[in-house]
Structures are given as C-alpha cells and as structure tokens.
C-alpha cells in the first residue's frame, strides 16, 4: 500500500506528494525507475558522432555548442574556486540549449506511453520558440478539448491575436493558442530531470531547502546504510525519509546544487534561474528574520 498520495496544491508545480500515514525516519517511501534515461551512452552519441540527429542545421548547432561549452569550462577552471562554487551561467545557458536539442530528438522516438508521462510533468520554462516541439493542455472549450494531450510544433507567433501558431501532428491543421496552454518538451526535461532521467512520481515532489526526504541510487543506499537491497531494474532509485514524517505532511526534495546552500539569497537565485520560482519554504523564511 502506498505511503503517500498526489494532491493538487498552490505553487509552481501544481501538485505535491503527501504522507497518508506516519512515516519513520529512514523508511523507504518510493522505489522507482526513470521512464526516460539520459545516460552517458546517450550523451556520447550526440558528442562523438558527426551527424547525431541527421538534421544538418541541428548537427552544426551541436558542434558549435560543444566548442562554446569547452571555452566556458576552461574560463571557469581558471577562476579561484572561492569566486563561485556553482557552474558558470554562460555554460549553463549553452548546456540548456544542448539539452533542448537532445531531449526533443529523443522524445520523438519514444513510445506514446513515455511521451504522455513526459508531458504530464510541469514545465517551469515554457520557452516556446519557432519549431519548438510542444504538448497542448488545459483547453476548456468543446473544440479545444479535442487538442488536449496532442503533440505539436510551434510555427510562429501571431502578434495581432497574441497567440502562438501551433501545428498538430499528424494533422497539419494550425490553431492559435495561448502560451499558458503549451508545454515544451525541452522545458519539461529541464524542469524535472535528475542525473538518472525523468521519473513519473519522484518528479512531482516540491522543493524545500530543508527537505524531509532524500533520493539515492540502490548502490548509494546500500553503501551509505550498509544494506543489501537488490535493484528491480537498472537505474532504480529509492526515496527515503530523512526524518519522522507525520500523516498529512508534504514530502519534499532538494532541487539545487550543494554549493548553493550557504544562504537564502544564493539558494533563491539558483531556484529562480533553474525553476522560475521564489522559494518561500519555512527554512528560507526563518533565515530572512
């Protein structure tokens, strides 16, 4: 029986996980395998092949991004480590664009089930641009409801109507939609991806700067807690309680890098940059006082 449930909440993610019962410290709450893995083999394919996407324009952009990322990394390594513990912003922007290209290409080859799970997650960025791969949701009119859940491409922006021109697959019909009804495939990936990939349940946990859970790979868990847990599938991760959790309490995760944990302003800056929200967790609010 599940120890938690998913509820709608006010906030950037719109949903959250809540304990259905008292959960003791160190209890395993979730065991989950990513429905989409962004592993090293995947990265090598795009980094090492001359034409990884088969699209000359995208392949040229990938090669250019690789060069620029290398330059940014060299600049960062030459700095005093006390200058900035986080990844340089100029490199992060380039990596985000690289992730957008790769995630969209991978999405197109995934099963319908994986695509539906992908687009069910939150998009904090909604960086809708021409030829961006998107999902449609939240339409309430009788005609609009027929488009909910469809995968489409943005073909431009109609300034007179203040709507995006959207072309649905496989039907070439074009419709005009508001930004609030669009999710970008790459934006969902950037908003939810962990090292192991995208998770259907784990990605619905909201952030706290003092979270009550932590997620580990099975080998990490066994080493840290001297256990002999056997993974059900490769890349399986487990989420455990870091403290005693009361029934009805929200389960929270830590979204940002360890180096950002020094003070509230640094944490909030990284959360704004990566996830587009202002953290109002209890830990941050107490630190402001």
Indicate residue ranges for each PLM-predicted region.
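Conserved catalytic SET/PR domain of SAM-dependent protein methyltransferases, capturing the structural core
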Residues: 1-153, 161, 168-174, 179-289
């Amino acid at each position: 029986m599940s120890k938690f449930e998913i509820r709608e909440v006010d906030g950037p993610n719109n949903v959250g996980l809540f304990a259905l019962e008292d959960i003791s410290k160190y209890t395993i709450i979730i065991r989950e395998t990513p429905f989409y893995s962004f592993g090293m083999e995947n990265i090598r394919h795009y980094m090492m092949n001359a034409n990884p996407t088969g699209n000359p324009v995208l392949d040229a952009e990938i090669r250019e991004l690789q060069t620029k990322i290398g330059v940014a990394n060299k600049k960062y390594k030459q700095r005093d480590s006390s200058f900035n513990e986080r990844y340089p912003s100029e490199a992060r922007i380039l990596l985000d664009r690289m992730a957008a290209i790769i995630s969209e290409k991978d999405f197109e080859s995934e099963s319908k089930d994986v695509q539906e799970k992908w687009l069910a997650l939150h998009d904090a960025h909604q960086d809708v641009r021409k030829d961006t791969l998107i999902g449609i949701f939240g339409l309430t009119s009788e005609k609009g409801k027929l488009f909910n859940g469809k995968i489409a491409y943005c073909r431009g922006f109609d300034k007179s109507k203040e709507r995006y021109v959207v072309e649905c697959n496989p039907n070439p019909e074009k419709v005009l939609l508001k930004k609030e009804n669009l999710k970008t495939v790459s934006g969902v990936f950037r908003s939810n991806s962990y090292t192991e990939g995208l998770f259907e349940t784990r990605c619905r946990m909201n952030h706290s700067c003092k979270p009550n859970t932590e997620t580990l790979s099975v080998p990490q868990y066994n080493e840290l807690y001297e256990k002999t847990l056997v993974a059900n599938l490769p890349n399986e991760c487990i989420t455990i309680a870091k403290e005693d959790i009361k029934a009805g309490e929200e389960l929270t995760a830590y979204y940002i890098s360890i180096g950002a944990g020094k003070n509230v302003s640094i944490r909030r800056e990284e959360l704004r940059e990566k996830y587009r929200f202002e953290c109002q967790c209890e830990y941050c609010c107490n630190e402001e006082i």
